[in-house]
């Protein structure tokens, strides 16, 4: 295996990281790897607490891809066992525990989604239940003896909960130990994670040392702020842009980020800036709107294609900017001649509930043809001539009465 020089590798690896523990150790590992012609083992774990990956996950996945491109071995761990514990990192209360079935089901699509960034041919995928579920209670007791309660309470989230008398369950103390055992089992050289994973990564480093294994280098990456501009990107907070979003949704949600996040998103999410040598900060200062549109096109092109990115932009301009219906709407036909507006919206799955539908009607967010509907008891007349129903900013439906057959 031919690797780039140690300096070249370090420059790429350290770029955009928050912390490397430690750079000297990483340099020694890279030097040994180069001398022996053997790749380093790079570990990244992901608990399948939800079935969708979002752009926040892509930050560490891109760093793992950089290691792949440098010739090293990428190991992606699907934490189907640790997901049953629930990672307490950054949480102010105990997380719900998943069943084994839920964890496995959520994990099924993780590798497929991660392969939009990683090279699947050069990625080793593991499920940590394969080794953690084999441990006996005596093994857990021996493992627990390597760490103290005082050491656990050093982590910020546990310390805050302890001082505020918010309950901390014993199984939460076991989470970093279980994640650390992944590193003991794999004997990996490097582990990647977000800044909220620092404590867990360091536990893995300590446990490797305790078990006579050369300690891993820990590399932390920034946590991506979500579209709301304030909280860490999270599906549960509604501020996420997901890998599996439609091209139109991905484009629109990217344009919804505050201008203050454009540079961060560019640096963390776009590996190669597209044919423009001007520094991104200068481009944002000159024309933030166009730079954000370019960012949105870049992201859609990464996860779909340049053609889909162009279509997504055209859709956004037509529907959001010019407030016109999409040109490719299928017609949804109903047998009824009239329908109460709330029932019609529910039949179209325009909103998740009747209460939400009523609220949106009262806010003036529902339109039939050119007429804004403000009465929640309004009745929509359906004829064989289709009418466009607009629900919210981005949802359009073409509805008509089914033609009678004789």
From Swiss-Prot:
BP-aspect Gene Ontology terms: tyrosyl-tRNA aminoacylation
Family matches, as CDD domains: S4 (cd00165), TyrRS_core (cd00805)
Taxonomy, superkingdom: Bacteria
Binding positions (ATP): 235
Domain S4 RNA-binding: 339-401
Positions occupied by motif 'HIGH' region: 48-57
Catalytic activity: tRNA(Tyr) + L-tyrosine + ATP = L-tyrosyl-tRNA(Tyr) + AMP + diphosphate + H(+)
Pfam families for this protein: SYY_C-terminal, tRNA-synt_1b
UniProt motif 'KMSKS' region: location: 232-236
SUPFAM superfamilies, per database record: Alpha-L RNA-binding motif (SSF55174), Nucleotidylyl transferase (SSF52374)
GO molecular function annotation: ATP binding; RNA binding; tyrosine-tRNA ligase activity
Entry EC no(s): 6.1.1.1
Compartments where found: Cytoplasm
Keyword RNA-binding assigned: yes
Cellular component, GO, one term: cytosol
Entries under Gene3D superfamilies matching the protein: HUPs (3.40.50.620), RNA-binding S4 domain (3.10.290.10), Tyrosyl-Transfer RNA Synthetase (1.10.240.10)
Keyword terms, alphabetized: Aminoacyl-tRNA synthetase, ATP-binding, Cytoplasm, Ligase, Nucleotide-binding, Protein biosynthesis, RNA-binding
Subunit structure, interactors included: Homodimer.
Protein family (similarity comment): Belongs to the class-I aminoacyl-tRNA synthetase family. TyrS type 2 subfamily.
Role, per record: Catalyzes the attachment of tyrosine to tRNA(Tyr) in a two-step reaction: tyrosine is first activated by ATP to form Tyr-AMP and then transferred to the acceptor end of tRNA(Tyr).
Protein name: Tyrosine--tRNA ligase
Gene name tied to this protein: tyrS
């Amino acid at each position: 295996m031919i690797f780039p020089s140690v300096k070249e590798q370090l420059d790429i690896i350290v770029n955009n990281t928050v912390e490397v523990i430690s750079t000297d150790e990483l340099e020694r590992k890279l030097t040994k790897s180069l001398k022996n012609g053997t790749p380093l083992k790079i570990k990244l774990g992901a608990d399948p607490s939800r079935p969708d990956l979002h752009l926040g996950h892509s930050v560490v996945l891109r760093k793992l891809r950089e290691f792949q491109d440098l010739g090293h071995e990428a190991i992606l761990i699907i934490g189907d066992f640790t997901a049953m514990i629930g990672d307490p990192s950054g949480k102010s209360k105990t997380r719900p525990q998943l069943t084994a079935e839920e964890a496995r089901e959520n994990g099924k699509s993780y590798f497929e989604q991660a392969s939009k960034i990683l090279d699947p041919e050069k990625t080793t995928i593991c499920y940590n239940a394969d080794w953690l579920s084999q441990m006996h209670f005596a093994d857990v007791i021996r493992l627990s003896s390597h760490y103290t309660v005082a050491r656990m309470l050093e982590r910020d989230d546990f310390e805050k909960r302890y001082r505020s008398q918010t309950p901390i369950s014993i199984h939460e103390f076991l989470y970093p130990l279980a994640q650390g055992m992944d590193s003991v089992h794999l004997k990996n050289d490097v582990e990647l994670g977000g800044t909220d994973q620092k404590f867990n990564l360091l536990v893995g480093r300590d446990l490797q040392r305790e078990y006579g294994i050369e300690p891993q280098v820990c590399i932390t990456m920034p946590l991506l702020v979500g579209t709301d501009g304030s909280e860490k990107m999270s599906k549960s907070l509604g501020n996420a842009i997901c890998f599996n979003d439609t091209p139109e949704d991905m484009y629109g949600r990217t344009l919804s980020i505050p201008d203050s996040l454009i540079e961060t998103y560019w640096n963390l999410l776009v590996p190669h800036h597209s044919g423009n040598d001007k520094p991104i900060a200068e481009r944002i200062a000159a024309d933030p709107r166009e730079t954000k549109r370019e960012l949105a096109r870049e992201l859609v092109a990464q996860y779909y294609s340049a053609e889909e990115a162009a279509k997504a932009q055209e859709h956004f301009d037509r529907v959001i900017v010019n407030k016109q219906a999409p040109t490719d709407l299928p017609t949804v036909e109903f047998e009824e001649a009239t329908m109460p507006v709330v029932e019609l919206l529910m039949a179209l799955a325009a909103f998740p509930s009747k209460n939400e539908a009523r609220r949106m009607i009262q806010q003036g967010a529902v339109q039939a043809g050119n007429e804004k509907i403000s009465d929640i008891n309004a009745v929509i007349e359906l004829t064989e001539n289709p009418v466009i129903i607009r629900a919210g900013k981005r949802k359009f439906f073409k509805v008509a009465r089914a033609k009678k057959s004789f």
